[in-house]
A protein has these predicted regions:
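Glycine-rich FAD pyrophosphate-binding loop
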Residues: 1-19
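Hydrophobic anchor at the start of a short beta-strand
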Residues: 3, 87, 274
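Dinucleotide-binding Rossmann-like beta1-alpha1 core, especially the glycine-rich loop
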Residues: 21-98, 224, 366-373, 489
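Flavin (FAD/FMN) cofactor-binding and adjacent substrate-gating region
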Residues: 63-139, 145-152, 230, 289-302, ...
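Short beta-strand segments that buttress and anchor functional surface loops
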Residues: 112-113, 156-160
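C-terminal catalytic lobe of FAD-dependent flavoproteins
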Residues: 119-121, 129, 187, 192-201, ...
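Core beta-strand elements of the Rossmann-like FAD/NAD(P) dinucleotide-binding domain
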Residues: 162-173, 177
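Low-complexity, small/polar and acidic-rich linker and loop segments
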Residues: 458-512
Length: 512
């Protein structure tokens, strides 16, 4: 198959990069959504094999607090086992031994195979793998219309926001995989996909207070999952319906911050005294059924729509719903339908084929085999790129010098990302390397990274404007939680960039 991916902005700019980073066991949905639970545990086991450098096998606890119904625990365990999910009731003392940060007042605990998954290297690995197999990927290309001949879609028109020009692409099949924006894309073809924009807000804390995922043992509700992710931890999420015209301009509200802090501290009381780095939100691409436009009974399951049989529109398919955990299965379903329509008899092999970076040993073995005594910077690079770290120059003093001290990002890694990972600006670079994602939120590293981009693109003015945009983007996440240390940090950043560097104003950040 000859394939082309068009991305409106950068990779992971939508819900893919705005989620919990949870390697779902499916336990959360076992009671309320058995189908989604089964899909999650199936994909959980697959990702542990094919994306080892992108996941951390932490395991998870579902804890019952005094205010919760302990009787729900048996229903929960039975539902997990029915879905094929390992779920073991353990003594509260054992739970606290395994995870000391959990609420000491817990009265019940269940251990499940949850984990942590980083959506940024996972997405990059998938895209790189597709390119190795002949796919073409164009970021910053927004689809503006679909080309139709009679009742058949034969291509798309897109606007290249980098080159500022319109482009036309023709194909035998067009796949609508636009997430929450899939509603609009479907309408361009004259089809209807009833999307239900469900906003979810999350908070990122300055360090990991927990090493296991901590869930609340109850039906899904606000702020009942605490996930350890890389150097930080995340509490979330909320859930509220968002007007469709606001999906590109989300703001985390004070009420959402209050809920996340209040409920999060019930899972791990230490959160109440832990610094918050930023707040962010994403929109779940939920699909209301044709007979339930209100969305009251929405599953997290996968929705694959053949618009030829559903709407009489040939050459057009939509794949939506689902979640990050089931992305591979979504792609398999869509690809199987594509092959059926195009007369291709090959079977999907992605469930058994390791992604680039995960072909060899685990990340610890890669580190020790690449360097006899790997340092923190080298280990961090392996954690982000897996075995592809062998393509990153870290052998000399200059290349191994740090750009981002918080996240141990070196000059060599930044240059590799610019040269090999389709980096156009600092926000792209952040998603490829974690530059600016640490405690200082780009305060000290953004200008260094901008300098490297200026050299690579041979355009200082472009780098300056990019720096302004990046600082603005970081500020948007700090603003909702700007008190205490975060307020002091933001003031210090203001002094550095405005007072010392003379940086003023700036364009709106690309991610809104």
């Amino acid at each position: 198959l000859k394939t082309l991916l068009l991305e409106r902005l950068d990779l992971t700019a939508g819900a893919t990069g705005r989620n919990h980073g949870l390697l779902h066991s499916g336990a959360r949905y076992a009671v309320t959504d058995q189908e989604s639970a089964e899909e999650c545990i199936q994909e959980n086991m697959i990702l542990r094999k094919i994306a080892r450098h992108c996941v951390e096998e932490t395991d998870g606890l579902f804890i019952t607090l005094p205010e919760d119904d302990l009787g729900f625990q048996s229903t929960f365990i039975d539902s997990c086992l029915k879905a094929g999910i390992r779920a073991e009731a353990i003594d509260p003392k054992e739970a606290l031994r395994l995870e000391p940060s959990a609420n000491k007042d817990l009265i019940g605990a269940v251990r499940v195979p949850d984990g942590a998954g980083d959506p940024f290297p996972l997405t990059v690995a998938n895209v790189y793998d597709a390119q190795l197999h002949g796919a073409e990927v164009l970021t910053y290309h927004q689809v503006t219309s679909l080309i139709k001949e009679g009742d058949r879609v034969v291509g798309v028109e897109a606007y290249d926001t980098q080159a500022r020009q319109k482009k036309t692409f023709r194909s035998r099949l067009v796949i609508n995989a636009g997430g929450i924006w899939g509603h609009h894309i479907a309408s361009l073809a004259g089809a209807t996909v009833n999307m239900f924009p469900a906003k979810g807000a999350l908070l990122i804390f300055g360090h990991r207070v927990n090493n296991m995922v901590i869930n609340r043992c109850r039906k899904p509700a606000d702020a009942d999952i605490l996930v350890p992710g890389d150097t930080i931890c995340l509490i979330g999420t909320t859930s509220s319906r968002l007007p469709y015209d606001q999906i590109d301009d989300m703001k985390v509200t004070p009420e959402e911050v209050d809920i996340l802090l209040k409920e999060g501290a019930k899972l791990a009381p230490e959160l109440a005294d832990t610094r918050i780095l930023r707040a962010y939100a994403g929109v779940r691409p939920l699909v209301a059924t044709d007979d339930d436009p209100s969305g009251r009974n929405i599953s997290r399951g996968i929705v694959l729509l053949d618009h030829e049989t559903r709407d009489g529109v040939k050459g057009f398919i939509s794949i939506t719903g689902g979640k990050l955990m089931t992305y591979r299965l979504m792609a398999e379903w869509a690809a199987d339908l594509v092959c059926k329509k195009l007369g291709v008899s090959q079977s999907c092999i992605t469930m058994d084929t390791p992604l680039p970076g995960s072909e060899k040993e685990n990340i610890d073995e890669i580190s020790t085999k690449t360097w006899s005594k790997p340092n923190a910077t080298q280990k961090a690079s392996v954690g982000r790129h897996g075995s592809r770290v062998e393509n990153i120059k870290l052998s000399d003093e200059y290349s191994s010098s740090l750009v981002c001290e918080c996240e141990e990002v070196s000059i060599g890694e930044v240059k590799y990302a610019i040269d090999e990972l389709d980096v156009h600006n600092l926000v792209d670079l952040r998603r490829r390397t974690r530059v600016g994602m640490g405690t200082c939120q780009g305060e000290l590293c953004a200008c260094r990274a901008a300098g490297l981009l200026a050299d690579a693109h041979q355009c200082t003015d472009r780098a300056k404007n990019d720096l302004k945009s990046f600082v603005n983007e970081r500020w948007k996440g700090m603003y909702p939680i700007c008190w205490g240390d975060t307020l002091r940090e933001s003031e210090y950043s203001q002094w550095i960039y405005s007072g010392v560097c003379g940086l003023e104003g700036g364009e709106e950040c690309e991610t809104k």
